[in-house]
């Protein structure tokens, strides 16, 4: 499971958070859930088009009623901003034309790009496009990441490696990369290298260490709590049905059959009338 699933979606709410934050319950055209998802994809494609040299790590989108906030995390903010902010103004204008709303553009710098999985994958892909041996490019990226403080890294390349006729995939791993551990802080990145032999996909997993129990408790406290069974409004509480009356654990007192007078200390009871085997009353 952990080997196949996307590490971000696998750890949502534990070590990762959504990169698109908005709410949609309207049925109007342009405000539906599908419309917002399509618009987010278009925004991210616009950011990646023509911005390869900027080293964009991720794009976060947050929506309000009449405004869209776009946070661009980049290793080279100067390229995104441009001279006197000309490039940033151009991006903001295109985003407002795409969304039809006021756009707040924030450009954030990635402090340590050597341990960012998306930037590492992009660096390996650029070397493959420059005809560097895929094994050399993978090992160079791994060594740089491990020297920068990462606890583990795994790099995988798939495609016509080395110009071979048959496509295959190879990966190298250094350190520890626990993909099944949910508390593990795993960063994941993917990038495609366009070579003369076709496209080669590059995937990178970087392990930054486990989050502490204190951080895990804080993240769980911040997450919305699921309603309990007795708090649900769609069905009544059925707890009273399951409760049973307490049983008397004292030994039963044998009833005395009154033949003439009741024994001392006990009340007189009615005589027990039974039937014999022939049907006559005793």
Curated annotation (Swiss-Prot):
MF (Gene Ontology): mRNA binding; rRNA binding; structural constituent of ribosome
Under Pfam families, the record lists: KH_2, Ribosomal_S3_C
Domain KH type-2: where?
Answer: 43-111
Q: Which GO terms describe its cellular component?
A: cytosolic small ribosomal subunit
SUPFAM superfamilies linked: Prokaryotic type KH domain (KH-domain type II) (SSF54814), Ribosomal protein S3 C-terminal domain (SSF54821)
Keyword annotations for this protein, in alphabetical order, are:
Ribonucleoprotein, Ribosomal protein, RNA-binding, rRNA-binding
What ranges does the record list as Low complexity composition bias? 256-269
In terms of InterPro entries, this protein maps to: KH_dom, KH_dom-like_a/b, KH_dom_type_2, KH_sf_prok-type, Ribosomal_S3_C_sf, Ribosomal_uS3_bac-typ, Ribosomal_uS3_C, Ribosomal_uS3_CS
Q: Its Gene Ontology biological processes?
A: translation
Residue span of region Disordered = 217-282
Q: Which residues cross the membrane?
A: none
Cross-referenced NCBIfam families: rpsC_bact (TIGR01009)
Family recorded in the similarity comment = Belongs to the universal ribosomal protein uS3 family.
Function recorded in the entry = Binds the lower part of the 30S subunit head. Binds mRNA in the 70S ribosome, positioning it for translation.
Q: Quaternary form? A: Part of the 30S ribosomal subunit. Forms a tight complex with proteins S10 and S14.
Q: What is this protein called?
A: Small ribosomal subunit protein uS3
Gene name as annotated: rpsC
């Amino acid at each position: 499971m952990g080997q196949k699933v996307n590490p971000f979606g696998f750890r949502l709410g534990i070590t990762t958070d959504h990169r698109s934050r908005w709410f949609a319950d309207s049925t109007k055209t342009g405000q539906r859930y599908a419309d917002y998802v399509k618009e987010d994809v278009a925004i991210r494609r616009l950011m990646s088009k023509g911005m390869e040299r900027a080293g964009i790590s991720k794009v976060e989108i947050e929506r309000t009623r009449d405004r869209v906030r776009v946070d661009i995390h980049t290793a080279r903010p100067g390229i995104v901003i441009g001279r006197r902010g000309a490039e940033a103004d151009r991006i903001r204008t295109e985003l407002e034309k795409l969304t039809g709303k006021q756009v707040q553009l924030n450009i954030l710098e990635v402090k340590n790009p050597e341990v960012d999985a998306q930037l590492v994958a992009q660096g390996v892909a650029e070397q493959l496009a420059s005809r560097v041996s895929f094994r050399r490019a993978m090992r160079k990226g791994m060594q740089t990441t491990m020297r920068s403080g990462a606890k583990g890294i795994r790099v995988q390349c798939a495609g016509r490696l080395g110009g071979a006729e048959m496509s295959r995939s190879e990966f190298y791993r250094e350190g520890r990369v626990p993909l099944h551990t949910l508390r593990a802080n795993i960063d994941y990145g993917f990038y495609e290298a366009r070579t003369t032999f076709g496209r080669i996909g590059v995937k990178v997993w970087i392990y930054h260490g486990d989050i502490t129990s204190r951080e895990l408790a804080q993240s769980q406290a911040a997450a919305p709590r699921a309603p309990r069974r007795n708090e649900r409004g769609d069905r009544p509480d059925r707890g009273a049905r399951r409760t049973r009356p307490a049983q008397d654990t004292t030994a039963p007192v044998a009833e005395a059959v009154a033949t003439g007078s009741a024994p001392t200390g006990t009340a007189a009871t009615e005589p027990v009338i039974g039937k014999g085997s022939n049907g006559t009353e005793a």
